Amino acid sequence: MKKRIPTLLATMIASALYSHQGLAADLASQCMLGVPSYDRPLVKGDTNDLPVTINADNAKGNYPDDAVFTGNVDIMQGNSRLQADEVQLHQKQAEGQPEPVRTVDALGNVHYDDNQVILKGPKGWANLNTKDTNVWEGDYQMVGRQGRGKADLMKQRGENRYTILENGSFTSCLPGSDTWSVVGSEVIHDREEQVAEIWNARFKVGPVPIFYSPYLQLPVGDKRRSGFLIPNAKYTTKNYFEFYLPYYWNIAPNMDATITPHYMHRRGNIMWENEFRYLMQAGAGLMELDYLPSDKVYEDEHPKEGDKHRWLFYWQHSGVMDQVWRFNVDYTKVSDSSYFNDFDSKYGSSTDGYATQKFSVGYAVQNFDATVSTKQFQVFNDQNTSSYSAEPQLDVNYYHNDLGPFDTRIYGQAVHFVNTKDNMPEATRVHLEPTISLPLSNRWGSLNTEAKLMATHYQQTNLDWYNANNSKKLEDSVNRVMPQFKVDGKLIFERDMAMLAPGYTQTLEPRVQYLYVPYRDQSGIYNYDSSLLQSDYNGLFRDRTYGGLDRIASANQVTTGVTTRIYDDAAVERFNVSVGQIYYFTESRTGDDNIKWENDDKTGSLVWAGDTYWRISERWGLRSGVQYDTRLDSVATSSSSLEYRRDQDRLVQLNYRYASPEYIQATLPSYYSTAEQYKNGINQVGAVASWPIADRWSIVGAYYFDTNSSKPADQMLGLQYNSCCYAIRVGYERKLNGWDNDKQHAIYDNAIGFNIELRGLSSNYGLGTQEMLRSNILPYQSSM
């Protein structure tokens, strides 16, 4: 539950542990040039037990009551040092105290320093017993970290635990620059609790105050403390000017919340974004409730709905209790289907098409586990498309390995499917799947022989409307029993590449799998949860062509593949390439005429797939993959990515993405596959780049172009300036945000973002380029 908080006004005394990577390290080093360091040996132990050393040009006194030192006075005790033109030492025996009270008055060019702070002023006072120190009308500077300011009176109390400023100011900017500062009539900073209390707080940019609060209690370190976080602002075409002012609330050691008023000018209201985190015996989780009381844009577009409250609720939970119980929640629900088109949210996207609402409770012990779950979908589609929910679903697994040379498993499932429409089929499905396998392996190969029986019973209801409108009739009660047999063998050959590359090693890994599943006509079963699985190289060796249990395709096939890898002398993989195919002895089918290729009687080498990775050097990397399906008569999908990465702030990446229209029609639901934006498939080229362009300036950008539509799919450009005491980030993004069916063209959203970050308050001196790239609608993913 630990949370780092870069607060707006939590600037009094902040720890700065600098990173040492790329430009961030250079900037951190530059910022430290104006920061003093503690170069004397660090003294440990009780300060009162340490001797006091006084050096001066002249001294006179009335022993043991007082003494006066003048001329280059230098007093040291432990890690503390006091220098002045004149120092008056007073010693009084307090009644009932074994030790006398020793105080010091310092006059002229007073300089106090220890391993945490430097105080300078014309007049000072110190208690040598308690180490309490006062300096009037002076300056202070943090030692070993950014932070300086002025005050009418500066106090050190509680063995340097507290710093108290009267009419004081603070900035993390280096000397000679007061770009921003915070001023308070009184400031009390508690180093131990890492909190600052500020009365009459004014935040200033240059000499101009822009924010005022009569009282603030702010976090000033890594401890979780309630307080305002750094605000943010941006401009978008869908919401115009937007402003965020988050507030962090440390409720308890095991729970906290972030409350963010989010003003949207075009919507004419404030959305309240409320994030709550918790940690308890049953697990950890996060809840988000976003609420917009009214939306004048939505009301104009949907006048029949009146004054619409718009909201989002998200709940994620994962936990284990008593080592055997498992609890999981993944729940997202919004007020309407346009929510993710109108508002940016990290809990969903307009391109997702639906929101998932899943609850599960599991029980697991050795050799056995069981899970009860419910799963629903909120579909965002104007065509009022139906969807199925599992209410409820029971999954059971029993394992018994090392039964002689065999491993055994029994998997069972019972689920009830309910549709969002009243006239669609519904069903109860019970599935039992016993498996026995014989695994054999050694260091150079493996052979796994497996046999299983898949028995499924369907009890289907509400079939009248469907059977009346379709030539293929569904049956009330269906039993499907299918055996499966599989043999999977793999070898690993290894050789030293001493002749070509000394120290390098190459492997050759051939793999062969035979799979047999007899054909069963499944046309009398409605498809409740099955969809085609993508066939990359690893996918060639799956047992199933479809996910779910409603469609289990017949198989009489051999899958062959080979992988070769190259490792350097440090055992780092530098290169690999895999290629494989599925050879069908008989047609793979389910009896479902709605599946296009089942109408074609094709056998032979139907599916090919290949993947490759090449780490060309420490700075260059290449990944690519291609899948070809003769049943679709086309390349199904392909992708490639070439990246140059000098460090975390300097990178260029070129990308290509392709999905054939036949593949989309075969894999996506009909309301997507027939949509205008997908009917020609996906064929995109793009580039992502991040590069410093001048001292402390950096630029990032992303551009993706769809060659089918001859239009850009996504564009992003960001510019950031980074200094020791602040960073400014400006970004522009134009992204696809839907499709206008009436006008038959894409809808784009233009967004301009503006963010200011105060520096010197945390350990991060990076340029922020990675964050900007990953926030893109087509987020950056490393190829290295």
Curated annotation (Swiss-Prot):
Record key words, sorted: Cell outer membrane, Disulfide bond, Membrane, Signal
Main subcellular location: membrane
Family annotation (Pfam families): LptD, LptD_N
InterPro entries xref list: LipoPS_assembly_LptD, LptD, LptD_C, OstA-like_N
Post-translational modification: Contains two intramolecular disulfide bonds.
Superkingdom classification of source: Bacteria
Example GO BP: lipopolysaccharide transport
Disulfide bonds: C31-C724, C173-C725
Range of residues in the leader sequence: 1-24
Localization in the cell: Cell outer membrane
GO cellular component: cell outer membrane; transporter complex
Protein function: Together with LptE, is involved in the assembly of lipopolysaccharide (LPS) at the surface of the outer membrane.
Protein family: Belongs to the LptD family.
Assembly mode: Component of the lipopolysaccharide transport and assembly complex. Interacts with LptE and LptA.
Protein name: LPS-assembly protein LptD
The encoding gene: lptD
